[in-house]
């Protein structure tokens, strides 16, 4: 284990405040950033801020390679470093920001569920034998909400009663930015059914709880629980590796396949950059090619 200098703890504490207050970054993301920065401070190691320079970046990258870390992991660590160096410069703790060139990382195209697989997944909770009616209806509403809106799992867990209207849900995304996302009639019906017939049963244990989706203890549903529920149902309907994010991918890709505008999809997904949304154009293209080879009589000619 590398030595933890007093400076490390001091910098991490200040960086945490910077990320949380100045940048408005979610707690789990703050934790991930700080873990990467602490690793940098320990691996080099950094004893004073004067040691944070271009050479320290090169040394850190070299040690990451020695640890046989993937390019994706290294890219994530360097993104964290770039934000950290900006914080240090802004706080006048360093005079010059070290230059960081991100390694080239191929974007892995997500595995996309077909519409048939999505339909099977959406219906699975109510078709699962011996499943408590509250759990089944709550999970059905969760699945429909994911697929109808494309929101992230953290955004779903943060939904409150006041965020839901007849046609839209108000979503609080990264950087605490809010956006309005339209919701389908069917998804709204599953939410209404859950709210009127089942949610109250567990809210009695915690009457002041305003979050939409509750655990059996009447508390806000945790991300880990949502992941477990989704993967449980997914294993019953497909051999693909499925997570809550898979429904976000399916939402975007199926919209593109039906000629939806890319900019509108970007807004609904809450992507800051259009490049993050453009990956779905490649997935949609692959889907079109696959259908061509499957159905066109002369595709192999």
From Swiss-Prot:
GO terms (BP aspect): cell division; chromosome segregation; DNA transposition
Alphabetized Pfam families for the sequence: Phage_int_SAM_1, Phage_integrase
Top-rank lineage group of the source organism: Bacteria
Span of domain Core-binding (CB): 6-89
SUPFAM superfamilies reported for this sequence: DNA breaking-rejoining enzymes, lambda integrase-like, N-terminal domain
Signal sequence, renumbered to the chain: none
GO molecular function: DNA binding; tyrosine-based site-specific recombinase activity
Tyr recombinase domain sequence ranges: 108-293
First-listed, main subcellular location of the protein, grouped into a coarse class: cytoplasm
Annotated GO CC locations: cytoplasm
Catalytic residues identified in the record: 152, 174, 245, 248, 271, 280
Keywords annotated in UniProt: Cell cycle, Cell division, Chromosome partition, Cytoplasm, DNA integration, DNA recombination, DNA-binding
Cell compartment(s), UniProt: Cytoplasm
HAMAP family: Recomb_XerC_XerD, Recomb_XerD
Family the UniProt entry places it in: Belongs to the 'phage' integrase family. XerD subfamily.
Biological role stated in the UniProt entry: Site-specific tyrosine recombinase, which acts by catalyzing the cutting and rejoining of the recombining DNA molecules. The XerC-XerD complex is essential to convert dimers of the bacterial chromosome into monomers to permit their segregation at cell division. It also contributes to the segregational stability of plasmids.
Subunit and interaction comment: Forms a cyclic heterotetrameric complex composed of two molecules of XerC and two molecules of XerD.
Record's protein name: Tyrosine recombinase XerD
Species name: Chlamydia muridarum (strain MoPn / Nigg)
Gene: xerD
